[in-house]
Amino acid sequence: MRLVLSGASSFTSNLFCSSQQVNGRGKELKNPISLNHNKDLDFLLKKLAPPLTAVLLAVSPICFPPESLGQTLDIQRGATLFNRACIGCHDTGGNIIQPGATLFTKDLERNGVDTEEEIYRVTYFGKGRMPGFGEKCTPRGQCTFGPRLQDEEIKLLAEFVKFQADQGWPTVSTD
């Protein structure tokens, strides 16, 4: 018996026949799948779709990890720096001194500070009421009176702030 599937290749249609040659020898398959109707094909797809979907979903984090270990460590280091230098004014992405200058995407875009480079520049040199934290920040009145941050630390902060803004400021553990 031979099943004819419209648009199916000879290989595909051979999968669903009751007799098939194996390695050039006329050998009968012990448990052939016989499809007589489109209903049988629909039934087969309905039975196979849920387990195949589950397998694909289970394997997808392995094949496509959301971020690398290095990015995770940088985010944690950025969170630690943020908690040390920025959280006094910008707790959970807000701004207790100037409410329209939060670290949420909408305000960052409106204020022209929506890229890592711009966040770095504002963190280094300051802007408006925000003091600069860079080692070479000038003029003196625009810069923090507290400890200055190294370039790499400001880069980590800029990456962290951009990442958090893109995520809507979820809680990040610094452990």
Swiss-Prot record:
One of its GO terms (cellular component) is chloroplast thylakoid lumen. SUPFAM superfamilies: Cytochrome c. Gene3D superfamilies: Cytochrome c-like domain. Heme c binds at C86, C89, H90, M130. Cyt c6 and plastocyanin are functionally equivalent. Belongs to the cytochrome c family. PetJ subfamily. GO terms for biological process: photosynthesis. It comes from Arabidopsis thaliana. Pfam families: Cytochrome_CBB3. Monomer. Interacts in vitro with LTO1. Coiled coil: none annotated. Binds 1 heme c group covalently per subunit. Keywords: Chloroplast, Electron transport, Heme, Iron, Metal-binding, Photosynthesis, Plastid, Thylakoid, Transit peptide, Transport. It is found in: Plastid, Chloroplast thylakoid lumen. Heme binds at Q98, P99, G100, A101, T102. GO terms for molecular function: electron transfer activity; heme binding; iron ion binding. Functions as an electron carrier between membrane-bound cytochrome b6-f and photosystem I in oxygenic photosynthesis. This is Cytochrome c6, chloroplastic. The keyword Plastid applies.
